[in-house]
Amino acid sequence: MHPFSRLFRNIQSLEEEVQELLGPPEDALPLLAGEDLNHRVADALNLHLPTADLQWVHKTNAITGLYSNQAAQFNPNWIQPEFPELHLHNDLIQKLQQYFGPLTINEKRKLQLNFPARFFPKATKYFPLIKGIKNHYPNFALEHFFATANYLWTLWEAGILYLRKNQTTLTFKGKPYSWEHRQLVQHNGQQHKSHLQSRQNSSMVACSGHLLHNHLSSESVSVSTRNLSNNISDKSQKSTRTGLCSYKQIQTDRLEHLARISCGSKIFIGQQGSSPKTLYKSISSNFRNQTWAYNSSRNSGHTTWFSSASNSNKSRSREKAYSSNSTSKRYSPPLNYEKSDFSSPGVRRRITRLDNNGTPTQCLSRSFYNTKPCGSYCIHHIVSSLDDWGPCTVTGDVTIKSPRTPRRITGGVFLVDKNPNNSSESRLVVHFSQFSRGHTRVHWPKFAVPNLQTLANLLSTNLQWLSLDVSAAFYHIPISPAAVPHLLVGSPGLERFNTCLSSSTHNRNNSQLQTMHNLCTRHVYSSLLLLFKTYGRKLHLLAHPFIMGFRKLPMGVGLSSSLLAQFTSALASMVRRNFPHCVVFAYMDDLVLGARTSEHLTAIYSHICSVFLDLGIHLNVNKTKWWGNHLHFMGYVITSSGVLPQDKHVKKISRYLLSVPVNQPLDYKISERLTGILNYVAPFTLCGYAALMPLYHAIASRMAFIFSSLYKSWLLSLYEELWPVVRQRGVVCTVFADATPTGWGIATTCQLLSGTYAFPLPIATAELIAACLARCWTGARLLGTDNSVVLSGKLTSFPWLLACVATWILRGTSFCYVPSALNPADLPSRGLLPALRPLPRLRLRPQTTRISLWAASPPVSPRAPVRVAWSSPVQTCEPWIPP
């Protein structure tokens, strides 16, 4: 049935022309290309763009447009996924060769790209830590803050993230890879050999500093060092009160005193003619080596909450002993110390500790412990409920050296639903969009996406199908530690949670603690109580600031999808070579197996599962589905008769089209979203994408669009009748078409046909009409033409009525290119009918190019004795090749 038959009969202005427009194609097609007819139909259907004085509609029943964005929905009961131990085998390529034999060059290249993956952008912009967790849910800011921090710590515990310890050190959990062994500092609590050697050298230099000090005169040394100790104690107490204890200031004061002592005693290092500048440098380097050695010796210790009075007294006694022992044996202050400073008698107590860089870090949440509550909803009541809140931070099993990693982030994070159909679980979104914007953007590599015709050519067969899903596929691929400074995420901590207040202001009244007291509201208090019920003592760890870098491939970078496609396609290629009787292909994290019988498919599945598990690749058992003869893939149902969309997409389109209001100007954002939904099913309709050309025009003009009742009912009728996309056949071309602006010609193996147009047409339009006539009169599924526009199959650039009818006529037709000099229909199109001559032999190759799904099946290499033996239950020994 003609797609426009009902529509033309309902248009009153076309009553006299309906029979002619629906008549023979050689008469109707040139008329459909006329500009006047297209304008009259557009007027009847009200497809012209409306005037600007009309008020636009920004929201329909199912689709939102401009100025009506839906607020994100936060689920307080989100279940965070549990990640298994995702660790690929260290010698992955060698292990694969044991199972699948020698790898091809392409397979090796793809695996080497991913093991490890590398990411080095042109420029990286760093953001303050306060932007680490995006305020995506303003009404649930605190709950989202702790849920996101807990998600990041869960990824760290699974070995997916590095934890930044200082500028040059990272720690993580799990087994180190071979490239991480070269940067090892500590493994399972034991120092690595190379790191131990450097520590011994530093200890020797530190001992030389002690020998130098013992040569100093006892009187001047004792007096000066006593003054030095008192000076440092005064400065540290002062900085403790203001919250600005500077370890660099202590180092500078100590070096100045040591320089004065040495110069006053006229003791020189090395030669007698050394200058005071050389002396100062020598003492400075000795002091740095002593301090570094001391830091390394205490590096394994962690600060832990112990709030008992005995511990406080012990810390005070240690402080008193340290300050009184003026000529002590060591010259660097302890890096983990506690001091009590009472700005008001017996009220406030601040705990200050220095990290491995020497910068002060304060556990402000602990500062509430010995302070008076500011009200009924003070955080003090929650903090004082437990004596031991656990450590402020943790250290992983492995510590490695890294490039300089700043105390900044490169992208924010937030949580969303796992997918539109699963709102009970959460998914982490990493916002690394800076690498895709601006003049320093990264040009990501392109990877092949399977189109609809290719899927039909490969998979439209009568096989038994099984689909597998790789669990957390992106997190299987490791990334080089050198890329960590470019992929940083983190949390600002609870003390910086309230972004309205500036955390950089300091005064003598404990401004940071006062900032924490600003959080003491009823809402925050009740939320923290509920969060404590969820996280327990871990709430203290989540409240601390931290910075993490990705150890595995993140999903928020454009490089990730390309690398994952390379990785899974290499695996599919190896399995395909070793099981020539089955079909194996992969797209992203989906792996599909096809075999002739279910028994054969079961045997392949069990073998692949055991091999992948040994390699460290985890499959999601819950998402493994046996489809039988109807494969569900990428939203399509693929059978031996062709490809059709799934029922859920068809029902969704019907619901959206019915909800569209009639005779109201809809803004272009609604048109964009509606067109995106309709485009998914458009290839299965009679008129294809050409039916949506009026919507395309409104979107390109950024204007409103008015749906008339006729156009809406016509779209509904189109999307109610769907036709499958069938497989292409490898046949020889026997029909050729050509045209001139005034005539057309068709050549077959047994006859030559020609004709003329009633009026001159554009050459591309004339060529398209000639191809339609050849398809109607010969029924050939393969046509030869010399016009590139017709060969492309994109008909949306033609007049609307002609494009719709041509899509209907040429549905399921393939084209092959023939040069004009060799086109046998060239002379008939010019009005000449020469004698028949042999046609050029052109054979159609079904479209399988630019796709990473299917690997060719070259001869399988001889199996090595160490490989797994597997015998196919299929009786025939000939390899099965997709059509």
Curated annotation (Swiss-Prot):
Keywords: DNA replication, DNA-binding, DNA-directed DNA polymerase, Endonuclease, Host-virus interaction, Hydrolase, Inhibition of host innate immune response by virus, Inhibition of host RLR pathway by virus, Magnesium, Metal-binding, Multifunctional enzyme, Nuclease, Nucleotidyltransferase, RNA-directed DNA polymerase, Transferase, Viral immunoevasion. It catalyses: DNA(n) + a 2'-deoxyribonucleoside 5'-triphosphate = DNA(n+1) + diphosphate; Endonucleolytic cleavage to 5'-phosphomonoester. Hepadnaviral virions contain probably just one P protein molecule per particle. Multifunctional enzyme that converts the viral RNA genome into dsDNA in viral cytoplasmic capsids. This enzyme displays a DNA polymerase activity that can copy either DNA or RNA templates, and a ribonuclease H (RNase H) activity that cleaves the RNA strand of RNA-DNA heteroduplexes in a partially processive 3'- to 5'-endonucleasic mode. Neo-synthesized pregenomic RNA (pgRNA) are encapsidated together with the P protein, and reverse-transcribed inside the nucleocapsid. SUPFAM superfamilies: DNA/RNA polymerases. Terminal protein domain (TP) is hepadnavirus-specific. Spacer domain is highly variable and separates the TP and RT domains. Polymerase/reverse-transcriptase domain (RT) and ribonuclease H domain (RH) are similar to retrovirus reverse transcriptase/RNase H. The polymerase/reverse transcriptase (RT) and ribonuclease H (RH) domains are structured in five subdomains: finger, palm, thumb, connection and RNase H. Within the palm subdomain, the 'primer grip' region is thought to be involved in the positioning of the primer terminus for accommodating the incoming nucleotide. The RH domain stabilizes the association of RT with primer-template. InterPro entries: DNA/RNA_pol_sf (IPR043502), DNApol_viral_C (IPR001462), DNApol_viral_N (IPR000201), HBV_DPOL (IPR037531), Hepadnavirus_pol/RT (IPR052055), Rev_trsase/Diguanyl_cyclase (IPR043128), RT_dom (IPR000477). The lineage of its organism: Viruses, Riboviria, Pararnavirae, Artverviricota, Revtraviricetes. One of its GO terms (molecular function) is metal ion binding. Residues 387-728 are annotated as: Polymerase/reverse transcriptase domain (RT). Belongs to the hepadnaviridae P protein family. This is Protein P. The record marks Y67 as: Priming of reverse-transcription by covalently linking the first nucleotide of the (-)DNA. It holds the Pfam family DNA_pol_viral_N. GO terms for biological process: DNA replication; symbiont-mediated suppression of host innate immune response. Residues 397-638 form the Reverse transcriptase domain. Residues 1-183 are annotated as: Terminal protein domain (TP). Mg(2+) binds at D469, D589, D590. Residues 298-344 are annotated as: Disordered. Residues 184-386 are annotated as: Spacer. Its EC number is 2.7.7.7, 2.7.7.49, 3.1.26.4. Activated by host HSP70 and HSP40 in vitro to be able to bind the epsilon loop of the pgRNA. Because deletion of the RNase H region renders the protein partly chaperone-independent, the chaperones may be needed indirectly to relieve occlusion of the RNA-binding site by this domain. Inhibited by several reverse-transcriptase inhibitors: Lamivudine, Adefovir and Entecavir.
